[in-house]
């Protein structure tokens, strides 16, 4: 067995128990660390994880660049490496952190893609309600835009967590953290139509009885299925943008900030732990204000 295997398993356990990270985040860390372990086993087979030096890590990062792996992916992998060696320090497995001086690529701040409100409306109105899944898809996309949910939060939404009388959803976010999120009347209307008139004709699979959005076999929708549904509707209106479920979330936040919403309130609704994550939307807002100035001010 590789000298990396037991430590990577312990790291995975630490991320789950101590850090309370989601399964998706843990999987991402695991896959990135496996890249490093494979590189070390191939090029420095006698070097255990606790013997790795800064120079080893720099060789590995250089190999990523040679494979033309994007700077954003490199930065994510380096972040995972730093987390792993912080864990080894925490466990007293090493006395010095070899990743401490490991440099990440300098990244320009990439602002997320957004949809305008008319584009959102066109996508929603393009959903054919005459098709069996039409009302489900409309309810689903209305919910994404109305509440700014992550796609994982959307597909995990349960009927018992919809509080229609007060206009809130209880969602399970990253790290299994719960939060209450407001939902608009239009989204609630389409959810109600879907549940009362269409979902009742589907026999839920065992263990999937409480999930709101089901496929034809009665199982909750997958992330990939939601992505494909959105791609189909974007193509239907001829919109040449790279739109994903996360685009609806970004658009939700952007439109709130452009409308003057308090950033702390937006942070709470998005489920961001840190306000700095939410602050990216203030940059979007400044771009919007600059656009208004250029369009309407008499002196260009």
Tell what function each PLM region has:
Residues 1-300:
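Conserved catalytic core of the tyrosine transesterase superfamily
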């Amino acid at each position: 067995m590789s000298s990396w295997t037991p430590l990577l398993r312990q790291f995975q356990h630490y991320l789950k128990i101590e850090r309370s990270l989601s399964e998706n985040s843990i999987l991402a860390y695991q896959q990135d660390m496996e890249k490093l372990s494979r590189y070390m086993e191939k090029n420095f087979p006698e070097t255990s994880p606790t013997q790795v030096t800064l120079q080893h890590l720099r060789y590995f990062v250089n190999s990523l660049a040679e494979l033309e792996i994007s700077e954003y992916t490199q930065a994510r992998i380096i972040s995972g490496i730093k987390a792993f060696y912080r864990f080894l320090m925490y466990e007293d497995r090493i006395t010095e952190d070899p990743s401490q001086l490991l440099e990440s690529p300098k990244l320009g701040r990439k602002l997320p893609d957004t949809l305008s409100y008319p584009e959102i409306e066109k996508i929603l109105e393009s959903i054919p309600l005459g098709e069996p899944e039409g009302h489900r898809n409309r309810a689903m996309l209305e919910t994404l835009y109305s509440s700014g949910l992550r796609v994982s939060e959307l597909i995990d939404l349960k009927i018992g967590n919809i509080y229609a009388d007060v206009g809130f959803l209880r969602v399970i976010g990253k790290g299994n953290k719960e939060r209450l999120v407001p939902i608009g009347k239009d989204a609630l209307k389409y959810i109600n139509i879907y549940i009362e008139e269409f979902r009742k004709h589907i026999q839920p699979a065992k263990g999937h009885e409480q999930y709101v959005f089901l496929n034809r076999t009665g199982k909750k929708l997958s992330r990939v299925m939601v992505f494909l549904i959105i791609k189909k509707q974007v193509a239907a209106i001829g919109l040449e943008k790279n739109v994903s479920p996360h685009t609806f979330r970004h658009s939700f936040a952007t439109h709130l900030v452009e409308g003057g919403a308090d950033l702390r309130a937006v942070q709470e609704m998005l489920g961001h732990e840190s306000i700095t994550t939410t602050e990216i939307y203030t940059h979007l807002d400044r771009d919007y204000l600059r656009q208004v100035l250029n369009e309407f001010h008499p002196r260009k």
